[in-house]
């Protein structure tokens, strides 16, 4: 049993020990059982939290709101237009005000420095719902999903395909190193995690008996994978010229049947969502009209296959976020 996490911020997994991460995963599994059996668990009744969103979201917002309500807390949501942080009021002042009114603060937005500063000034636990650099709550959901499917995670190999510079790849590399999971970043050689973070993770991985591998070779990168993971290539609001460049660069790293067949028998597919695997989204249709692509980072065949565990993974956001809030607020 690790030392108490009460009062701690949850900003990045580098701040947590292997034992602390394992504790959060065990707690999440317990909360999932309570939810599935309909057992009330309003353990934090009387507390209030605020969700500070500078970037919109479906899964993160819903996970925090449902988890907060399940725990008996009041939940306030501030959308990108509802907060004066950084506009009429400094980040420090906003953090101090919110910290006087709420028992915990979730932030989803841009630079990691913003959430770190919130954590420095608020005086209450601050949770990172996503920044440009890291996405720690997603990682707990990912590993819980892997644990549920295989029965264990230590010694497995996870391959991330695509732009490995992003927050998801960064966070996957960290959590894999912490938990003894071999991590492979498979993508263009100029789209790899920063050298400093790679060096840090390799040191942690060595202590936990696993490896960090960077490769541009799809066959080598996916050969021994138990888990194939990817993320979207483009985002709404980015210029079309950037879309074309990124699609051309990342197309060789699409997750398709050939990739899954090259992985280990029984390999699973994970994706943090949303995904552009068909034409049922505005961006998907726009990409099709401009570039003739019906599928992007993953084919519809793989996305809908029995190997795909993306909806288990999405549900697990709620259970793992509940664990983080309970552990830091109890």
Q: What residues fall within each predicted segment?
A:
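Positively charged, low-complexity intrinsically disordered leader regions
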Residues: 1-62, 66
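C-terminal helix-to-coil terminal segments
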Residues: 2, 286-330
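Active-site cofactor/substrate anionic-group-binding motifs, chiefly glycine-
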Residues: 48-101
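Short, structured coil segments at secondary-structure junctions
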Residues: 71, 101, 121-122, 179, ...
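Anion-binding alpha/beta catalytic cores of soluble intermediary-metabolism enzymes, centered on
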Residues: 96, 103-175, 271
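Rossmann-like adenosine-cofactor binding region
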Residues: 203-299
């Amino acid at each position: 049993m690790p030392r108490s996490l009460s009062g701690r911020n949850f900003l990045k997994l580098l701040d947590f020990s292997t034992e602390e991460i394992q504790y959060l995963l065990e707690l999440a599994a317990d909360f999932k059982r309570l939810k599935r059996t309909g057992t009330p668990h309003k353990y934090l009744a009387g507390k209030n939290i605020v969700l500070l969103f500078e970037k919109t979201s479906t899964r993160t917002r819903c996970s925090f709101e449902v988890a907060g309500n399940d725990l008996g807390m009041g939940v306030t949501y501030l959308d990108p237009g509802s907060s004066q942080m950084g506009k009429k009021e400094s980040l420090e002042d906003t953090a101090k005000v919110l910290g006087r009114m709420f028992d915990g603060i979730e932030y989803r937005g841009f630079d990691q420095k913003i959430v770190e500063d919130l954590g420095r000034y608020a005086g209450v636990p601050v949770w990172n719902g996503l920044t440009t650099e890291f996405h720690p709550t997603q990682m707990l959901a990912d590993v819980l999903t892997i644990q549920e499917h295989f029965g264990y995670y230590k010694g497995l190999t996870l391959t991330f395909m695509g732009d490995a510079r992003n927050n998801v790849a960064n966070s996957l590399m960290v959590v894999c190193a912490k938990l003894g999971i071999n991590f492979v970043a498979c993508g263009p050689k100029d789209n790899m995690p920063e050298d400093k973070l790679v060096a840090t993770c390799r040191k942690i991985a060595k202590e936990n008996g696993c490896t960090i591998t960077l490769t541009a070779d799809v066959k080598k990168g996916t050969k021994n994978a138990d888990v194939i993971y990817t993320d979207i290539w483009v985002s709404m609001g980015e210029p079309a010229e950037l879309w074309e460049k990124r699609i051309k660069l990342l197309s060789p790293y699409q997750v398709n049947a050939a990739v899954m067949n090259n992985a280990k028998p029984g390999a699973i597919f994970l994706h943090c969502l949303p995904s552009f695997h068909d034409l049922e989204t505005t961006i998907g249709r726009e990409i099709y009209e401009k570039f003739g692509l019906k599928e992007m980072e993953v084919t519809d065949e793989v996305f809908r296959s029995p190997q795909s565990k993306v909806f288990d993974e999405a549900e697990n956001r709620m259970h793992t976020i509940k664990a983080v809030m309970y552990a830091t607020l109890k």
